[in-house]
Amino acid sequence: MSLRHRTVPPQTGRPLAAEAVGIEEEPYNIIPVNNLLADHPSLRFPEVRAAAAALKTVGDLRRPPYVQWRSHYDLLDWLALFFGFQKDNVRNQREHMVLHLANAQMRLSPPPDNIDSLDSAVVRRFRRKLLANYSSWCSYLGKKSNIWISDRNPDSRRELLYVGLYLLIWGEAANLRFMPECICYIFHNMASELNKILEDCLDENTGQPYLPSLSGENAFLTGVVKPIYDTIQAEIDESKNGTVAHCKWRNYDDINEYFWTDRCFSKLKWPLDLGSNFFKSRGKSVGKTGFVERRTFFYLYRSFDRLWVMLALFLQAAIIVAWEEKPDTSSVTRQLWNALKARDVQVRLLTVFLTWSGMRLLQAVLDAASQYPLVSRETKRHFFRMLMKVIAAAVWIVAFTVLYTNIWKQKRQDRQWSNAATTKIYQFLYAVGAFLVPEILALALFIIPWMRNFLEETNWKIFFALTWWFQGKSFVGRGLREGLVDNIKYSTFWIFVLATKFTFSYFLQVKPMIKPSKLLWNLKDVDYEWHQFYGDSNRFSVALLWLPVVLIYLMDIQIWYAIYSSIVGAVVGLFDHLGEIRDMGQLRLRFQFFASAIQFNLMPEEQLLNARGFGNKFKDGIHRLKLRYGFGRPFKKLESNQVEANKFALIWNEIILAFREEDIVSDREVELLELPKNSWDVTVIRWPCFLLCNELLLALSQARELIDAPDKWLWHKICKNEYRRCAVVEAYDSIKHLLLSIIKVDTEEHSIITVFFQIINQSIQSEQFTKTFRVDLLPKIYETLQKLVGLVNDEETDSGRVVNVLQSLYEIATRQFFIEKKTTEQLSNEGLTPRDPASKLLFQNAIRLPDASNEDFYRQVRRLHTILTSRDSMHSVPVNLEARRRIAFFSNSLFMNMPHAPQVEKMMAFSVLTPYYSEEVVYSKEQLRNETEDGISTLYYLQTIYADEWKNFKERMHREGIKTDSELWTTKLRDLRLWASYRGQTLARTVRGMMYYYRALKMLAFLDSASEMDIREGAQELGSVRNLQGELGGQSDGFVSENDRSSLSRASSSVSTLYKGHEYGTALMKFTYVVACQIYGSQKAKKEPQAEEILYLMKQNEALRIAYVDEVPAGRGETDYYSVLVKYDHQLEKEVEIFRVKLPGPVKLGEGKPENQNHAMIFTRGDAVQTIDMNQDSYFEEALKMRNLLQEYNHYHGIRKPTILGVREHIFTGSVSSLAWFMSAQETSFVTLGQRVLANPLKVRMHYGHPDVFDRFWFLSRGGISKASRVINISEDIFAGFNCTLRGGNVTHHEYIQVGKGRDVGLNQISMFEAKVASGNGEQVLSRDVYRLGHRLDFFRMLSFFYTTVGFFFNTMMVILTVYAFLWGRVYLALSGVEKSALADSTDTNAALGVILNQQFIIQLGLFTALPMIVEWSLEEGFLLAIWNFIRMQIQLSAVFYTFSMGTRAHYFGRTILHGGAKYRATGRGFVVEHKGFTENYRLYARSHFVKAIELGLILIVYASHSPIAKDSLIYIAMTITSWFLVISWIMAPFVFNPSGFDWLKTVYDFEDFMNWIWYQGRISTKSEQSWEKWWYEEQDHLRNTGKAGLFVEIILVLRFFFFQYGIVYQLKIANGSTSLFVYLFSWIYIFAIFVLFLVIQYARDKYSAKAHIRYRLVQFLLIVLAILVIVALLEFTHFSFIDIFTSLLAFIPTGWGILLIAQTQRKWLKNYTIFWNAVVSVARMYDILFGILIMVPVAFLSWMPGFQSMQTRILFNEAFSRGLRIMQIVTGKKSKGDV
């Protein structure tokens, strides 16, 4: 043990410190800071005592008045008494500071001379980092910092006071923590008051020593936090739960950005002026600050105007050039250059600058119109800038227009391109030069990125003046440029993407459209089939022809991005050495270097490899090269006596033990995988059995082949394979030991065996073995030994049989094995025969087999038996796919590049934070037993899906004492529940995974500090994984309670028995796990089962802490709120409260999850915090690499060190259904290849809710790890990434470590998740963060940002719009007669449309989603497997799923931008193999998919019936197949991917349930699941809260349904070919008549149907007669025919739907007219019945078709079938007998 771990004598009775000083014993969190003499492992570190002592240096500071000063008070108490901080806030931050300062001092290299005092450099670095944002804020506002410390005269006590003051403010700021500059303002003023106290200033008013403006109990909370909190709460209340338009209330960002201007000093003052308009929520309040969010698609243009300018200008230029191209026989490039040489073309190309200036004007007008509310008396400059921007843009348009007009005017005058005309062109170009000056300057700064950063980050007013015009003043978004190398990398990427895109667009999109456009443009005398409003002009037709082409043109960069990012991602992955070890076979080849890899990467090395500099990096690279490919002696072989081998054995066996505890390997597999201890005098390293399989047989065959070869040559051949050499030596040594063990020591037989092995050893040493013994006889000896070991291995074997085999072996060895036959006399002389052979049979009474309780002996025998008998390759060990994957990934990761691991003492400390609300903790007995309607229970499902793991679990339980399986429900119920919970998405699974960090750190701390002797003795003592029952280690220290063997704690391990005590303290100092269980207090009060299970988790995991919000009644109907931290005290055997910090009010003002995280954030510790969601998991072997990952913070990635470390994820929910597999594959490619490319080379990786590791203090002072404003921050986690990038952070991605993640597995769950993400992206479009990133990032990073965030969803929506534009355009051309006249035979048009249809189809099929999957599979699993997986996906209808998902994303993204309505959607995390009813599917998908699909299907039918192209079936199919595929996918996907989706009986029941739902007359409390009417009203909620613009756009979009009527009525026979407008107007009489009839029927039903039913029937009869008479009259007196009735349905049903949708938008005033509104509701019900029947018809038909249900089940569960699972039993509900 090192000097660092000086032990403290154990205490007896009351702590010494408590006796001496009288400090009351308080529960502590990690270290008892108030009692430094306690017997606690952490207090053995001198750094802890030094940090605590530093806080005690109050010295001569002026004491606070009015309170009694106690001797044990420290600097934080001093601050609290002066400024009125809460006691528990002080206690919390005291521990926080002590832990951080101690950990920081531990990392000092070299260590300070005096380890018992705190180094001043540690405090200084901490202060600089923590207050960096404050210093930047002061500089930005031009205020002098109130940190009065100079580097020349360091003052550690003053530094500690500043740090302590900031942390105390932050710890009590509650919701204000989301507003970092607000906290800066508070700190600035309080630091000023602190300085006055420290400088002994006098109060100007009283002449007394200066006192803070606020002091006393809870003064800070009530005087500072509460007023600002109340303001936030008032704004939230005004927002009506976020439903009011964003522009009408202030969110967190608005209030925070108020502190970005110096008006906060003049308006707010200090102490806070509560009369300031800042605090007013109504009337003349401050209003929006910094940015105004408005619901409009124009914000996509505002935020990314540079992208749209680029696309618009190229499209314009391409059309101009292509229009002027002269088709000839030359190449396409020659035609292009010839067109460009023409002066007319060159001049027309100048019009792009008119367009550009027009787009600038649009941008300026949008800025002014949307941001006008920001204008106030204090922001006059902002108003002036917006106004001048509009004027300047308008001036440029006028200037360019005049100059351009002059060019053509001069040319027309001169009738040629004269010199005068050329002069006019030059004048235009001079203006262009002036116009482009800002762009040229931007380009120059792009090439020199450090100059741009300098200009933006420098707060000199001259630079503000220079940049004021181009970008508004903003505290964030400055200095975002990357280094030159990164700049070149991502620029090159985008140059290739854009070059490909524009080449493709010109030659395959624009150019083919020119000829048909010219034909249509010049077409005259079109035979229109309706009333034409535009005369003979075909401009509208041309526009419709171009619309789908333009839409695809605008979005197809997304396709090219997907292609290039896949290629680049694969290249980066290859250089990162991903996928080099893909399976157990490849691991087998590298396993001998594996120990060295663990030593190199996971064990700290005392060498200069960590030092900076090119030389050391080069040495490190050489070391890694040797390691990766086994070059050089150090990485070649391990001998059994090496400490390195023993450390490796301890780590490897601990990993295998973790696998066994998780039941992913069996007991037998543990024996095959473990590295056993060095026993039985084996002289080589004892590799795991799965590596030695078949090696002995191969060695024997080599010996047989080389029968005449000398010893040296034979041994050389065997030693070429390390495993073979070890197998031979171990088998020989083990057989020798076995024979000598089972034969009694004092017998002649023992002596004979000893002599025989001496002879063999002598022959080996003298290299005479092949000359002494018959090598050809070895197989016979081998077979005999096999029998012998087999008999010994059988614990019930009769010793007589063993004697017989030994006698046979003796005969072979003595009579046949020697080359020179020996006589009996020679054998006797050599001691190989008994002295009196005739007295007894040899071995008769000499055998003594060890007792069956000798587990170690028989374990070694089993191993020997395995080495002797294994003839297969054992590639199937372990059997479990998850175990194989984890071993392969872990082993591969150790050959990847990663920082070296420091000692645990010197590593960065970190926390894990998990937000939890009310999800499952542990499955209850009832949940496991309850069955679905198909008779399937959760446990049965898990037994079926995880059959091998269930078998392993039962094996473990039987080993622990159960006799029958029924005992699992009694004595082992807890184990059973945990086993099931670990296979769901439960909190128990997450906690188990995270606590592996603690277990790993304890083991690594032991290995760090253990001496060579400790390691060797430990390996001898343990060596193998003997303790499979998981008893808890280290209990002598009193930190882990005595628990049963089924403990959920992961502290249990074989290595833990070697711990010396300090490992626990070290691990606790470095790791804390906080679960933010927001409502745990109320769950306890209500005695909910979740509370009991959470307590159980705390009981089993000593590093686990629970943070919750406690609501305490305060009288008068008021409630006090507290942030509380609790733990389980194993000595008191109860839950104890550690800290209780009072809050200003309810936590949840904004979005729930970030508010939950924020309140618990004050209880986290360390330099980093990892955000883990409730559906995530981790693994022991991955936890070993955490300290390597944290070292990344010390390395530069580009020009900055990281602030977020991205971590790879493994999706663990894709193992059964094809749907789960599709989602898993999509997510896997996103979280691996996608994130890899975003981080390198694109440098735009954000935080997407992954298990990323945050630089805790960096984020602590910059707003936290998420944003919480209501609705706008619905995707709360991604805003942490936005905020990080905007504030100059750096996000990286690391794939040598991974965690598990669960995903939704049912279509409805997946759809809700997609809806949530799409809605979140819709809100992001409106946000200030996206706007600032769109403007502040350089051009190429802006492109990366757009196409990987909101652009992806926008482009998905564009694909859907393309389908609409294409089909509506074709219908227009068909119904108008234009298609018949001009385009029916236009092959050019079809070619152009074919290109865009193909592109649309590529996206629709999910191919651009699938491409990254294929590439990632190729990289990590192999190319052939990737192709096979892709083919399987297509066979299993993945294209249907991706097309359906595309519709979900497009619907919710578009609707959120237009109307809002984004909300958290609970997707559920259960196991989905149950059938979902038709009603549920209809409710979920009616508006997002079904209605749209029916509309598109109707368009296709109308087009087919009226288009001349439809007569050519091949052309029609080619043009509409993609659209029909979309229609079918949107209608059928919910049934294709629904278990038993085509079961006839279920279909019948579903339809009955649907009709009941439609006609259900609900009450007030009715839910939408019960009543159609309730659901129908809920579906309109977004229209209730939308603005006038949203309603206007909605009505405009609805007008398309009236086009059906306009187009079709002219096709009716009754129209008689007339094209008069009156035909259309008369058709409305039909609509009006139907509506009147409907009102009459409704009136009659309401009045007569109940009491006078005969009258109701009479009215119906009269109306039917009237209708018949009208039809007869029409047949008699007009050209009406019966076919018109059916044709008119295609016209009038869409019209009715359109009227209905418009009525919904006018619901507010229509509801005042009850009869009309009731009619609207009734009509809506009829339409939903119609839609339901239309959807049900194909489902019913397929259900009726024989064999289709079986085929659907096979498609949906093919993955399970291929694994041999009993999936049919799950689907059909037929259990097999004997299931638990």
Curated annotation (Swiss-Prot):
GO terms for molecular function: 1,3-beta-D-glucan synthase activity. Glycans are attached at N1712. It is found in: Cell membrane. One of its GO terms (cellular component) is Golgi apparatus. It is an enzyme of class 2 (transferase). Highly expressed in flowers. Expressed at low levels in roots, leaves, stems, cauline leaves and siliques. The keyword Hydrolase does not apply. This is Callose synthase 12. Disruption phenotype: Plants develop smaller leaves, and collapsed and inviable pollen grains. They are resistant to the biotrophic pathogens Erysiphe cichoracearum (powdery mildew), E.orontii and Hyaloperonospora parasitica. The keyword Glycoprotein applies. Induction: By salicylic acid (SA). GO terms for biological process: (1->3)-beta-D-glucan biosynthetic process; defense response; defense response by callose deposition; defense response by callose deposition in cell wall; defense response to bacterium; defense response to fungus; innate immune response-activating signaling pathway; leaf morphogenesis. Involved in sporophytic and gametophytic development. Required for normal leaf development. During pollen formation, required for the formation of the callose wall separating the tetraspores of the tetrad (interstitial wall), but not for the callose wall surrounding the pollen mother cells (peripheral wall). Functionally redudant to CALS11 (GSL1). May play a role later in pollen grain maturation. Required for callose formation induced by wounding and pathogen attack. May interfere with salicylic acid-induced signaling pathway during defense response. PANTHER family: CALLOSE SYNTHASE 12, LYST-INTERACTING PROTEIN LIP5 DOPAMINE RESPONSIVE PROTEIN DRG-1. The chain crosses the membrane at residues 303-323, 349-369, 387-407, 428-448, 490-510, 543-563, 1349-1369, 1395-1415, 1422-1442, 1490-1510, 1517-1537, 1589-1609, 1621-1641, 1658-1678, 1682-1702, 1729-1749. Its main location: membrane. It comes from Arabidopsis thaliana.
